[in-house]
Amino acid sequence: MADFGISAGQFVAVVWDKSSPVEALKGLVDKLQALTGNEGRVSVENIKQLLQSAHKESSFDIILSGLVPGSTTLHSAEILAEIARILRPGGCLFLKEPVETAVDNNSKVKTASKLCSALTLSGLVEVKELQREPLTPEEVQSVREHLGHESDNLLFVQITGKKPNFEVGSSRQLKLSITKKSSPSVKPAVDPAAAKLWTLSANDMEDDSMDLIDSDELLDPEDLKKPDPASLRAASCGEGKKRKACKNCTCGLAEELEKEKSREQMSSQPKSACGNCYLGDAFRCASCPYLGMPAFKPGEKVLLSDSNLHDA
């Protein structure tokens, strides 16, 4: 039997299930107790009672699961998470489980790669496969009896994983070196070489070796033509029987319609023969119907009574 790196004074847990032979379990525990000595401790846990045992976090240095000779133990995600919880930071898990060599999504038995992924998802690091070995006829029979699974593609795989050197959810204050900001009055030093690189003097403008681009040469004759206002209008601007400018019109149609509206208002204003009726009685004719009425604005609507009309 491998010693799994167990030394004196360490706390070790052995996880077993109903498929584990009693004599084999007792023999394994005796060998482990000899390695841990009086200062260490070896705990034996049934896999179905592990979640109910309520061990404190970081209770064990090493956990051996499914390693009792003759065991055919399967590990669920909950069991693996509990094992990771009760392992001490830096502690190791050694696990043995029957796996399928062919992928079968309907099988309760995982493949070796899926088992390694499950260990990683439980929070363990440095997960690696140690060895593979075929099942004996007795172990095949045990898988059939205890797991209700029958397959010709089974083998045992032994995997190890390590808990990180910190507790899940632990925190630590970071020491940040914050430098004091320089005073606003202190200006940063200017690199003379950089300043010279970005400086363009008048002498440079007269240098024939300087290749300066005339911006006017970048324009085509078409660019210099004044555009026709009609060409700037949107395709749908002013369509329909009633011309109407778009909202936030920029093509000039709104101003054009406003001018047309002003001309219509001016043409619709009433005109008198003399054109002075609105100025007051001093400017009105003798026969003006507005005699006696105060001055009014041009185009203002004025109502005449029947008596005024008869007098006129």
Curated annotation (Swiss-Prot):
[4Fe-4S] cluster binds at residues 274, 277, 285, 288. Its main location: cytoplasm. Residues 274-288 are annotated as: Fe-S binding site B. The modification Phosphoserine is found at residues 177, 182-183, 215, 272, 305, 307. Ubiquitously expressed. Highly expressed in heart, liver and pancreas. The keyword Mitochondrion applies. SUPFAM superfamilies: S-adenosyl-L-methionine-dependent methyltransferases (SSF53335). Monomer. Interacts with NDOR1; its oxidized form can be reduced by NDOR1. Interacts with CHCHD4 and may be a substrate for CHCHD4 chaperone activity. 'Ana-mors-in' means 'anti-death molecule' in Latin. This is Anamorsin. It comes from Homo sapiens (Human). The lineage of its organism: Eukaryota, Metazoa, Chordata, Craniata, Vertebrata. The gene is CIAPIN1.
